[in-house]
Amino acid sequence: MENELNLRDEQMNFIKEYLKAMKGFSKETYNHIIDVSQLALSMAENAGLGATETKELYIGALLHDIGKLQIPSEVLHKPKLTNEEFDLIKTHSQKGYDVLGNLFNENIKNLVINHHEKPNGRGYPRGLTNDQLSESDKILAVCDVTSALQLPRCYKEGMPADKIAEILTESAEKGDLDAKYVNLMINTYLNPLIEKQNQEKEEQYVLKLTR
């Protein structure tokens, strides 16, 4: 990882310590972070991003939920939130941006603060609109939602790929996510997964018939 990303020692140590802390604080969030970073790498390649943009997107994906370390665990893992608790959760993107200080460049910090922004301007914390978001911002938002739907949490099961594709499509139609990158996620990641899951269902059905 060091050689590929050409990070300074202090940056590398920061990321390692942060991931270790997150794994101890919230295994679910840690799993989500790793999942999002892998999805982001794949999307960057499929979208044809350059080497620098890909590196920054990957680092931003790893760091995007760092602000959740400042959210009480009982709130972070609560199935149903009050309005006040949800408002507290929503502060994590700003907190993440702030905690990075001058250690990472503005492109990476913007990925952290912007991952809940929406092209239609209804996101948080700043209510940015499509023209104010970078391509990497838009990709990370799609990866974040995909992973959140896909992975199980203590209060919910993970969704099958076909349902995730349906929700992403609806979100793109409403302007909550970028349509181009939703289509890319569906075509390159979810459709092959749907095919695999359908095949597994068929195999399980055949097994039941032969018992």
Please report, for each region that a protein language model flagged, where it lies by residue.
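Histidine- and acidic-residue-rich, metal-dependent catalytic cores
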Residues: 2-211
